[in-house]
Amino acid sequence: MPKSVDSLFLARTMNRFNPIVLVGLLLSPVLFLALAGRTDGNRPHVLFIAIDDLRPELGCYGSPIAKSPNLDKLAGEGMRFDRAYCQQSICSPSRASLMTGARPDQIGVIENTAYFRELNPDVVTLPQHFIKHGYEAVYCGKIYHARMTDDHHSWSRKPAYDRCPKMKWLPGNYALKENQELWASNKEKMLAKYGKAGSGGLIHGPAYEAADVEDHVYGDGFSTRLAIATLEDHLERKPSQPLFLALGFKKPHLDFVAPKKYWDLYDRDEIELASQTKSPKGGAATGLHASFELRTRHGIPKSGPIGPDLAKTLLHGYYACVSYVDAQIGMMLEALDKAGIREDTVIVVWGDHGWHLGEMGIWGKATNYEIATRVPLIVWTPGMKARGQSTHALVELIDLYPTLCELADLPRPNHLAGKSFVPLLDEPKSKWKKHALSQFPNPALREWAANPLSPGMRQTFFGPLIKEVEGKIIRQQGKSWDRDLFENHLMGYSLRTEGHRLVAWMDYRDLDAQPVFLELYDQKADPDETTNVASGNPGKTDALLRQLKRELARAPPRPAK
């Protein structure tokens, strides 16, 4: 806010109060933080909120069930992006792509186990770029994938742990003793049976929990407390320095764990199961997984369908987690208002990818379809003209890096693959991108972290399920079946246009070769992507394939080592 506004505010205060009262006001913490929030150079603060595994399942996106009043209000005061897409529908690649401003192929991060900094030691990340231009940058919660937090480069300080009560460690991240014991027992069994290497990803307890505890007992509530304390600490210590504050929520990622009061917001009888539970007719057998991530949880069938009662409980848990996170965001926004810096802050809320909640017969992320690649994106800026509106423009998460640079009046790094969507904040109906590009390596024959099947995975309880999925692919491919290609080198590239989605399954070592399989979905006639119409529309399929290859040529995969 301009200094003249502060001067006017003080002048009015002088006229209304005597000097003794005025001194008391100036010494009050709220007013101190309000005045402290003015930054040098009028550069805005940035509140950068990431939500794990959240698809656009919010009231503001038309969900008839989800209770998300705080995000709904933010969208009503900012801008809602109705067609925003991630670059890969799994945690580490999606987040690394957004934070570096490059596509997964460009940085070589196509699985959770790949660390972008090891592969790209000189890349300048989004918060790193802000630090270079005078910002303080700090994160609370999950921004990058676990153990790949890039602390040395991306962040200039640690959160204010000294101002926040410590969080009690929860075994397995469960609050209920019986669930902690189930987790510990499962851990012991998996380690004994498969060893440390073979049990990776298999050690879990129940898929859900509804403990009657305070919000901060679980991680997301603690992260919110910590972020608020860090905000206050920064405004006291460095009042004139702009702050890039990243707050990352781990829910509604499995396990669906949230305080009981958020479960109580929902009437179980009103929760509807997915209506489209079949795989796409004529679709790629390699395009869907067998819900591996969910099936590692205690009490979930290791094969076969998820029954309706269990499915409803899982949906209930997902919605409870959505409301839990929404409440935390409400507290964070209230802290901005209390500090008096809301009008000096750019707010961005994004989900890293979508999630199948029974759609197409599976549970989880990790596909190239609409339900997994489309994400929620809400932006609020102090000076936006199209307040309270939405846009149908196609945008991608890699567009956030250049957008925030423009909003903060920072130079744009040369390596960015995205496009600033600042013009949409003024005119949401502007002509925009013709497509959004996502990718995912063979979901059917990869582990749930997108990494190739480990040597021992076929020997676990997933062995029969892997064999079943593999059999479907072999039957579809016939003589073209190549185990090494399908397990290690097959990439699905998904091009989303105004009216269609093309999914081209290709050997990413040779993008000039003929695709192994092609899928085409008519988004206007078939928004649920129930039927692959590629064979009946060769002209449209070929045109979109050429368009896809042109885009891939601009950002080719890193050479395989």
In which residue ranges do the predicted regions lie?
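Positively charged n-region of N-terminal signal peptides that target proteins for export
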Residues: P2-K3, R12-P19
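Bacterial N-terminal signal peptides
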Residues: V21-F32
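Formylglycine-dependent sulfatase
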Residues: L35-R501, R509-A513, T531-R550
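Short hydrophobic beta-strand that contains or immediately precedes a catalytic carboxylate
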Residues: L520-Y521
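Intrinsically disordered, low-complexity polar regions and short flexible loop motifs
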Residues: D526
